[in-house]
Each structure stands twice: as C-alpha cells, then as structure tokens.
Amino acid sequence: MAFAIVAGYLIGALAGYAASRGNRIAVQWRRLIRVQLLCVSAVLSFLAAWRLPAAADLIWPALVTIIAIALVGAAYLVTPKSSERAGRAVLRGWSAIPNPGFWVVPLAAAIAGPVGLIVAVFIDRVMIFFFGFFVWILRRQAPIKQQMRTSWIDQSPLIALLIGLVLNAFTEPPAWTSVALEWAAPLLAAIGAAMFVGSVLHPSQLIPWRPGIRVWLVLIAMRIALLVPLAFIAPNAPIAAVLVLCAFSIPAFYPPQLSVLYGYADSVVAAASRLGWVFAPVGVLLAVTIMRV
C-alpha cells in the first residue's frame, strides 16, 4: 500500500506538471477541478459518512476541525481590509489547515492501520461541513463571477456527506465500502497531486510568493503548537499518529484549485504551495515512531 501511495503521488505530480505545460488543458482546468470535486471528493464523503460507527468517533476529528477554524480566524485578523478580505482570509487560513484527504488519509492507511485510517477520513469529512461555508464565502467574493448552476457541484462533497449520514442512520454499510475506502488511498494521492501541481502552475497563480512567507509561517506555527499537544493525550497510537501527520502536514490542495476556479491570486497561498512540504518528513517520522513504540 505504501508503495502504491508513493507511486500515486509521483504519477499525479507528473501529470499535473504535464497539464500545466499545455495551454489547451490550462484553459479547461476550471472544468477539471469541478469534475474532481464531483467524482472524487463527493464519493469519499458519501462512503465515509455511511461507515461512521459511533458519535464518539467524532471527538478527535472535531478537535482538529476547531483548530482549522481558528486558523481561518487568525488569517482574517492579519489580512488587510478590502472587498475580498473574507475570501482571501479563507484561502490563507485554508492553506495552513492540514491536508487530510490527500495526505493524512493515504499516510494513515500506510502507517496507522484501519483505526488511523477511519479517524483520518472522519477528520476530512467533519471539515467538509465548514469547507462548504468557506466555499460559499469564496464564491460570494470571487473576482470571477460564478453562475448559480455551478453551486451544487462546488458543494457536492457536503451534499454527499449528508446523504451518507442519512444512510448511516437507517442501514448497515456493506463490506465493500470499507475496501473501497482503503484502496481509494493511492487514487486520492494521484488525483490530489495532479490537481494541486496543475493549479499551482496555472498561469493565473504564477505570482510573487515570497511576500506571503511571513503570514504563512505564523499560521503554520499556530497549527503545530495546537495539534502536537493533542498527540500526547490521544487514547491510542493510531490516533496520535494521525494527529502528528496533521500537525506536520503538506499544504492543503484546495486553496490553489479554488484560487484558479474563482479568480483569486494570493501570495500566502503561493508561499504555502511551495514551502509547505518541508515539514512533512517530520510528521511521517514521528507517526512511524509512535506506531512502533
């Protein structure tokens, strides 16, 4: 599984780079982003919600989500006043939020086993409720005017999550849903890497990124300071491993994609996309160590 995940990232990154080199694909990139939202993120939301075993399993995902919201709040305080302040603050804070869907979930599958995988998936899905609100803000203040008919596509992960929760309340999830979640990890890695690299290198995002380093570092320091202590009080090793993977996560993949989709271009997002990878080896090393102790 670990080899498949690494291969997925490499293949996806190469595909995203190749796509960025072709003007024809770059023109269609916004449509590809929406296809990914509808066909990948929505399916994962549906499966994870259907397999939710107990409300108690949401405690740790809820704590991580609260920290994510705090990061967006902090980003709002350091974002200059403008007509796009709320939208830019969402993108900046989101850039410092852990990347559960395309990093923590695949790595948890490889390192922390089934328990860690379920916790990681729940973190990703609980955040969807708030990501839906973030998307609403981004659409409302988008420099590129959005059509109402695209709203349901942009919110499809949240809609799918709600459908999965309804099924969870009235039916038992079939066994194949567990297998599908586990083997989705390499696919998530490949698709996530492709869409991320292609979005970062999209012509609209090739802006000076060094001015955004200072704000990004403040937000990352806040993320690490809030998440690492939780790992020490986690009830078991898989949850602790997932928490350190969140603390030292790679950058979130959605801010560059949504920047392309809605017409934003922010130096903090650009800085996070380029520098946010440096902490990832620390998280992987700590997670492996926790599982072996």
Task: Map each language-model feature to its residues.
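Alpha-helical transmembrane segments of multi-pass small-molecule/ion transporters
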Residues: 1-293
